[in-house]
Structures are given as structure tokens and as C-alpha cells.
From Swiss-Prot:
Ethanogenic BMCs can be made in E.coli by targeting pyruvate decarboxylase (pdc) and alcohol dehydrogenase (adh) to them. PduP(1-18)-Pdc and PduD(1-18)-Adh strains targeted to the BMC (PduA, PduB, PduJ, PduK, PduN, PduU) make significantly more ethanol than strains where Pdc and Adh are not targeted to the BMC. It comes from Citrobacter freundii. This is Propanal dehydrogenase (CoA-propanoylating). Pathway: Polyol metabolism; 1,2-propanediol degradation. GO terms for molecular function: acetaldehyde dehydrogenase (acetylating) activity. SUPFAM superfamilies: ALDH-like (SSF53720). Coiled coil: none annotated.
Amino acid sequence: MNTSELETLIRNILSEQLAPAKAEVKGNGIFPSVSEAIDAAHQAFLRYQQCPLKTRSAIINALREELTPHLASLAAESAAETGMGNKEDKFLKNKAALDNTPGIEDLTTTALTGDGGMVLFEYSPFGVIGSVAPSTNPTETIINNSISMLAAGNSVYFSPHPGAKAVSLKLITMIEDIAFRCCGIRNLVVTVTEPTFEATQQMMAHPKIAVLAITGGPGIVAMGMKSGKKVIGAGAGNPPCIVDETADLVKAAEDIINGASFDFNLPCIAEKSLIVVDAVAERLVQQMQSFGAMRLNSEEIDKLRAVCLPEGIANKQLVGKSPATLLEAAGIPVPAKAPRLLIGIVKADDPWVTSEQLMPMLPIVTVSDFDSALTLALKVEEGLHHTAIMHSQNVSRLNLAARTLQTSIFVKNGPSYAGIGVGGEGFTTFTIATPTGEGTTSARTFARSRRCVLTNGFSIR
């Protein structure tokens, strides 16, 4: 018996031990209870551990190929079911998640050698990861997390937002089936028939959930922190955008409009406020109007604030709605050509500036100079360490802002979405773990770093 035949025999024996023939594997990813779903995902993980890396790679490649024809319909269904955002931008987000999320190539191996021998660092899976997906980015988060977590060798229990139930369950079923056809293992990706808040609580407390990956607001992240498990938490953001007097105003205006209007400002990385130096404020606003922004006067801003931010808190019924819908809700006439973004000059303490509203209304605050802009941006970002954007031709100022704000994503002279690999360099992620410090997540985020030491050898220098 040669080495290859021996490896095959051992793998078959281990598979039989981990999944006895008499125990029928049930389910296609969707289960009636949390316990059944997690148990199935755990059994799937035990079998998945025995697969070579090329199996993980085959699954990722198949996902990229087979999900591509469905991205547009998933985007349309997501927008329709949640009532937020628009199908065109959701398609772009789905495509970015599918094409730009790294696979097993992210699991780099590091070796150190010296007189005492060799040290090897490699990434290994955690087990079953409990992933919470939001209603703002439901399908893109599920695609992104599935690729990252499966590439790292884990199985996944998804806890979709109830407001995106139908499209999420449809996508999870598709991913589970693609993975099964690649490796013969059922239930690598699972969820429950009725995703609820109570189901999420049960998942977080389940002993077979090794790690929690939470993409959502501060409340759900805080709940996960109380579980006693390792949490990779993606919380809220309130990204400020600074424009100084050296900026290319035409490019800045276009980039800001593109970023702040993207999916009706639903992405947590999108520009939420604009802080501009007085000297160029009026010219920047005029350029923004030329790219499709509608400037509101103080009376119109007050009307809009009353319906969109009652008592300073975002009206959930208007989150992720179009500019035209916001205008109609406030009783403001909608132009014949609907605007891409609403803008208006406000004071620094306006609720539009101090709260993450997730609406296509960009408040503008004018300041005397760059130092004042940076001070205000630091205050507006509130130490969330999420995202900030700046437009300037002054490299020293750009570096100072990046160092001062300490955000997980800092975009220089581009639209905010360049920070997640859309129209910019780098990989895509929709789980930006700011509260827990991992930042932009990828496959290696969902793996354990392990150290293997061999003494007295393997240094050939």
C-alpha cells in the first residue's frame, strides 16, 4: 500500500467514526430549532476538519461561480423585503462581497528559523461560528462571512435579521447546497426556520458555538459580549468627512456624492457628515449640486429633521429611504429630477451631525481652518474607531488626520466605499470589527493562530 492509499484509508476510517453510518444526516441548512441547527453544523465541522485545503478552495470557487447569476435577484429581493436601500447598489455590494472576499490565500504561514530550530505559525479553525447579520446588508454580509469562515475551516450558524428573513434563508440554502455538492458534507452553513431575537439569544448561549461574529448595532454587540465567548463585533459608526482648502473640489464633490448616496446611505462606512473649511465651502456645495445633490435651506432642514430625527433619534420608518421619500415625508416639494442626495448647512451640535442616521441627507458644517475641522471630526466620530474620510492635497494633514482619528478605515481622496474594496484597492468585508479591534475582517480573523516548534534543526543558513 503506497502513501496516497494509506492517507485515503485513514481519512475514510476517521469519517466513519465521526459520522456513524446509522446516524442519518438531516437537513439542508434550515432547521426548526437552534439546537438542531447547531448540532448539525458541529457534525459538519468535524467532517470538514478532515478535508484538505483544496476542498475549501473548491467550495469558495464554486460559490463565486454559482452565486454570480443570482446576485441581481438577491439584491432586488433584499431591497423589496427590507424596504431599505436600492437594488442597483445592493447588487454592487453583493458582487464586491462575492468577488473580493479573500479565500484560503489569506491564511498565510509564517516560519522563523535560528540556531535553536524552527517555529511555524499557522491558522486553524475555531469550530462553529455564530454569525449575526443585519437588515441593512443582509445578503452581502452572509456572502462575505460564508467565504471567510468556510475558507478558515469553520462551519457557520447564521442568525439573520427577521426583517430580511426570506432573502437570507434563500441565500443560506443556496450556499449550503453549493458547499454540499463540492465536498459531500451537509450543513456547513445553517440557520433556523424562524430567525428571532430569542433564537439569537439561544445561539449565543449554546456550548457548541465557539466564536460570535456580530454585524449590527451596539445593543446586539453588547449582548454578545455578555455570553462569555470570544466576540468579533462590528458596531456602529458615524463617519465624518473632512475637506480642506487644498482639495480637488470637483473630485471631492463627486466622491462625496457617490459615497453618501450609495444604497441610500445604509453602509456604516458611508459619509455621515461633511466638515469643510470656510474658504472653499460654497464652491464645494455648488459642485455637489452639479453632481445631483439638492441643497436645503434652514426651514427645509428643520422640517426634515422633525420627521427623520424625532427627539434626535432616527425614525426607523425612514432609514434607507430615497431622497424623494424623505422630501415627501417632510412635505417638501420633490423636483422633477429626483436628487441623489440631500445636503444642508447646519451647526456642529445638530442631531444630523451627532447621530448615525443612515439616510441620504448629508449635513454640512463649516469651520475656520483644518485644525478646527480635525477637532470637530474627532468629536463627531465619538471614539468609535470606525471610518473617516478626508479630501486634501496636503500629505502632512492627511497623515495627521489618520493618526489622530485612529479609525479602522481611513479613506484619502476617494468615496467612502473605497475603504471596503469597492472602487479601491484591498479586499472586501462587511464585518468591520471596531469595538473588539479586529477591524476589516477576513478569513484569518476567523481562525486561531497556532505555533509549532521544532528544536535543533531546519535552519539551513
